[in-house]
From Swiss-Prot:
Family to which the UniProt record says this protein belongs: Belongs to the protein kinase superfamily. Ser/Thr protein kinase family.
Region (Disordered): 359-398
EC number(s) on file: 2.7.11.1
Active site per the UniProt annotation: D198
Pfam families found in the cross-reference section: Pkinase (PF00069)
Name of the protein in question: Serine/threonine-protein kinase ppk23
Localization (cell): Nucleus
């Protein structure tokens, strides 16, 4: 009985301390956000000085991108989705009678000039062309100077919508095929010194021939070695690497690889691996599953700005991911573990991951033409979950 009382008191004390830490964290974050806004403004001003080439794209003076046409050359069919930086429509190219995606750029009513996120997307998609990166075909304009659309190839789905609505899990052979394509695109992007900085299921588009493509390059940017100081206001919280959450002043390609690890787990379970409510809560969810960092495993951890806000358990902790996702093979677990290494220096690269034994063991990756066909969310079909029933009965695509 005494032991039970002691445990209750210890639990209550731990909760009180955690609440205090959370309050301190929030206060510091408010101050940090003000500082970050200033840094972001300075970064955007610096980037504005280096976007002359991107402005040439809009003027039609770049051979890599077809010159600006009119939006009148396209028929807008229906809205697919709306985000912070744009509205995406399904459209029809009147000259070729082919479907396209039309992304209407959102202009800040209080801003001056072309949105920096859209300039980044145009510059990135014009510089890094790959079979598994969505293709930017044209930039078209309407009658108004702020009526600007990016014309992209049309993809029927995004991975998040599929994972939310599928009645059964992807087969392991299908997960491997999707992962290989994601890693191939990322390896190509990293080889050309670009970071995506917002990899997540909703930014992975998929068509009905088993192809997956990276999209939404609004936060993407070129990087260099040694790593330069970059804004930490990147990557959706649930897919954000621990070094970003801990306030690392600089970072590199490893942040994209962490996001891929989270996506890999989500492809298998159809549930986000770390669904934190705040940055501190996200860190605790990561450490509770993967174990708390040690000096041996991650020496630089204790030098990061917010590391001293983390309350460490009194006893050593270990990864619980194998019990959390029990059906993984040894090789699948090893790949996931290396993608989700707390220490970014030990995180596997996209090029290394492509050669991992996981992709060579049985079952082998499925031929994309044997992938099931899913209803396109562009037609509103994805809202009806019953249309996903018996989706594996689809015949191979020709």
């Amino acid at each position: 009985m005494a032991g039970s009382k002691w445990e209750t008191e210890e639990t209550n004390q731990f909760a009180i301390e955690n609440q205090k830490l959370e309050e301190e964290w929030r206060k510091k974050r408010r101050l940090e956000k003000k500082r970050k806004r200033k840094i972001l403004e300075e970064e955007e001003k610096a980037e504005e000085r280096n976007i002359d080439a991107c402005r040439l794209y809009l003027m039609g003076n770049t051979p890599e991108l077809k010159s600006c046409n009119s939006i009148d050359d396209y028929e807008i069919l229906e809205k697919i989705e709306e985000g912070s930086y744009g509205i995406v429509y399904r459209g029809l190219d009147k000259s070729t009678n082919t479907l396209v995606a039309l992304k209407k750029i959102k202009f800040d009513p209080n801003g001056i000039g072309f949105p920096i996120t859209s300039l980044r997307e145009i510059e990135s998609l014009s510089s890094i062309r790959h079979d598994n990166i969505v293709e930017l075909e044209k930039v078209v304009v309407g009658k108004d100077l702020k009526d600007v659309y990016l014309v992209m190839e049309f993809m029927e789905h995004d991975l998040k919508t599929l994972l939310d609505n599928m009645p059964e899990d992807f087969l392991q052979s299908e997960v491997k095929t999707l992962m290989l394509q994601l890693l191939a695109a990322t390896a190509f992007m990293h080889h050309h010194w670009y970071l995506h900085r917002d990899l997540k299921p909703s930014n992975l588009l998929m068509n009905n021939t088993g192809e997956i493509k990276l999209a939404d390059f609004g936060l993407a940017r070129p990087v260099s070695e040694p790593k330069s100081s970059l804004t930490r206001l990147v990557v959706t919280l649930w897919y954000r690497a621990p070094e970003l959450l801990l306030g690392a002043p600089s970072y590199g390609k490893e942040i994209d690889m962490w996001s891929i690890g989270c996506i890999f787990a989500e492809m298998i379970t159809r549930t986000p691996l770390f669904s934190g409510k705040s940055e501190l809560d996200q860190l605790y969810k990561i450490f509770n599953l993967l174990g708390y960092p040690t000096r041996e495993e991650w020496p630089q951890y204790f030098l990061l700005p917010y590391a001293n806000k983390i309350k460490h358990p009194t006893v050593p902790t270990h990864s619980k991911i194998r019990t959390s996702i029990p059906n993984l093979t040894g090789n699948a677990y090893d790949l996931l573990n290396r993608l989700l290494s707390l220490n970014p220096a030990k995180r596997i690269s996209a090029k290394e991951a492509l050669e991992h034994p996981y992709f060579y063991e049985s079952p082998r990756p499925k031929d994309p033409k044997f992938f099931p066909t899913f209803p396109s969310k562009a037609k509103g079909e994805s809202k009806e979950k019953n249309v996903f029933q018996s989706f594996r009965s689809a015949s191979p695509k020709k």
